[in-house]
Amino acid sequence: MFHVPLLIGGKPCSASDERTFERRSPLTGEVVSRVAAASLEDADAAVAAAQAAFPEWAALAPSERRARLLRAADLLEDRSSEFTAAASETGAAGNWYGFNVYLAAGMLREAAAMTTQIQGDVIPSNVPGSFAMAVRQPCGVVLGIAPWNAPVILGVRAVAMPLACGNTVVLKSSELSPFTHRLIGQVLHDAGLGDGVVNVISNAPQDAPAVVERLIANPAVRRVNFTGSTHVGRIIGELSARHLKPAVLELGGKAPFLVLDDADLDAAVEAAAFGAYFNQGQICMSTERLIVTAVADAFVEKLARKVATLRAGDPNDPQSVLGSLIDANAGQRIQVLVDDALAKGARQVVGGGLDGSIMQPMLLDQVTEEMRLYREESFGPVAVVLRGDGDEELLRLANDSEFGLSAAIFSRDVSRAMELAQRVDSGICHINGPTVHDEAQMPFGGVKSSGYGSFGSRASIEHFTQLRWLTIQNGPRHYPI
């Protein structure tokens, strides 16, 4: 069992009132983590520690910040086995957590490279003798709120670029992966970033609204970033706006996967299966809508054969490549969506079956607009086939969603696919590649109900720095009074 204290000012500590909560395995129900349940006073203390550490961290030479972040990346990889062991918190497969560590280490290295890429401008002034500059400076304390579904990647992403830009951070961990997020904080601290540069707060689930509001309202917190559901993201966005705190929000998705009539169907099937079912479909970029034209019958037949080879189950079983859902409630929620579609005429092509938190991958065909699965994010191992006639109809179906995070188009005619990609309402679109694709140096963000702002190295600089106008007056200046 993992014991998870808070990390405040470089020191592990219990909650001020000694309260704890438990995280249980979604597979066995056994206690996996016993976790400090932060009070409002603990939230204040974490921000105060970050604020106290800010001047020294911001004043470091960029090469020194780079060196410390690179050490953190190496240490993260060295402790990969500890992160993999923490997969028991979420029931995920070990290969998913291994991939998490690999990509998260890359994010730290990319952030390290950005410490010398924070640039300003010299701007011509209309005032004689005035030398005018636009400069970017660290903001102060940044609050990062990370989810459970890709806990290492998204926990590191919440803090890496804010740190590279010279800010200090408070990471509010997920109640469903608290040890994983606390371990990220420990790795960064052990890499020598400094006491208070990274602080980690965990809270009991029932305390989350009060703790988050307290953190956002704190005057020392200057920026907020949140990755999670659209429902909670709206609340975070409203709180941030109320307190005039700029926020980056990366929220839900219902990624469309367009298969044109000239597509390489074998390649499309492999990408669709990976995008729809990896990590049980619990990824914001997961392929949820397979939008297919004249080749639909052949594509569905090939994909059904692929899905039949995939198995969800105990992640310790080598045959269970998909792992578990986050809990049994998630399975019940998804099954309600599936049952609604089947009752309204959808066809279950292959798969299905729910046993607690284990849901077998499923493919549904003949899904139509009146079914909830047409619009609602399933966040599970369910993909639906939508049939259209021609490119314009496929594009209409792709854009007929409140979400707009990731998308994919498969076609042998790249020019044709690019013309469509430019009209898909999404922050990300991949041609002949899966919807699930992330790289540290790429701008990552959505549109519509998938949020606003972008993560990624250069894209993050604008958000996690303050743009200022500075002038130097050389020589006399005329004033009208």
From Swiss-Prot:
Catalyzes the NAD-dependent oxidation of vanillin to vanillic acid. NAD(+) binds at G228, S229, T230, H231, V232, G233. This is Vanillin dehydrogenase. Keywords: NAD, Oxidoreductase. Gene3D superfamilies: Aldehyde Dehydrogenase, Chain A, domain 1, Aldehyde Dehydrogenase, Chain A, domain 2. It holds the Pfam family Aldedh. Its EC number is 1.2.1.67. PANTHER family: BENZALDEHYDE DEHYDROGENASE YFMT. The active site is at E250, C284. Belongs to the aldehyde dehydrogenase family. GO terms for molecular function: vanillin dehydrogenase activity. It comes from the Bacteria. It catalyses: vanillin + NAD(+) + H2O = vanillate + NADH + 2 H(+).
